[in-house]
């Protein structure tokens, strides 16, 4: 499929999963079946993410965001023709401003890691699940 080739040109071979690499991944921590999607795209920065979403939009390709796949809201259930956009590689601590008391995190930073970074810098992450 051309759209998948175009996306791979942006994210590289490590940034896109297809076939068994998709279906062998669990759809969530509470779901035993595999993910049903055309592909899982794993951008490593917002520039790649933006380019991928532009291609998907131009091709009217449905996408579903994938975060931690806890399934608490069941908002990340994909269907066979859709593309999952995973945040797993968007996992960098981008900046810590102790004066402004802010931390800039990638969308894929696990909550526990974010809380630990905040604590190490005498800050508090105001999210509690």
Can you say where each PLM-predicted feature lies in the sequence?
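N-terminal accessory segments
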Residues: 1-29, 58-61, 68
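N-terminal glycine-rich flavin-associated loop
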Residues: 7, 31-63, 87-129
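Short clusters of hydrophobic/aromatic residues that line enzyme substrate/ligand-binding pockets
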Residues: 16, 25, 72, 93-96
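Short glycine/serine-rich loop/turn segments
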Residues: 30-33, 77-79
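Active-site cofactor/substrate anionic-group-binding motifs, chiefly glycine-
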Residues: 55, 60-65, 70-77
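Short acidic, glycine/serine/threonine-rich loops at helix termini
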Residues: 74-79, 115-117
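Short basic, glycine-rich beta-strand/loop surfaces that mediate nucleic-acid
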Residues: 80-87
């Amino acid at each position: 499929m051309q759209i998948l080739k175009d996306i791979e040109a942006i994210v590289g071979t490590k940034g896109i999963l297809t076939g068994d690499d998709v279906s062998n991944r669990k759809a969530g921590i509470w779901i035993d079946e595999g993910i049903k999607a055309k592909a899982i795209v794993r951008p490593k920065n917002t520039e790649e993410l933006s380019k991928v979403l532009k291609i998907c939009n131009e091709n009217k390709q449905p996408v579903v965001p994938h975060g931690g796949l806890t399934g608490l809201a069941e908002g990340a259930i994909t269907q066979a023709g859709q593309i999952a956009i995973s945040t797993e590689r968007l996992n960098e601590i981008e900046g810590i401003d102790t004066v402004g008391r802010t931390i800039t995190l990638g969308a894929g930073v696990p909550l526990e890691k974010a809380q630990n970074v905040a604590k190490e810098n005498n800050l508090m992450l105001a999210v509690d699940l």
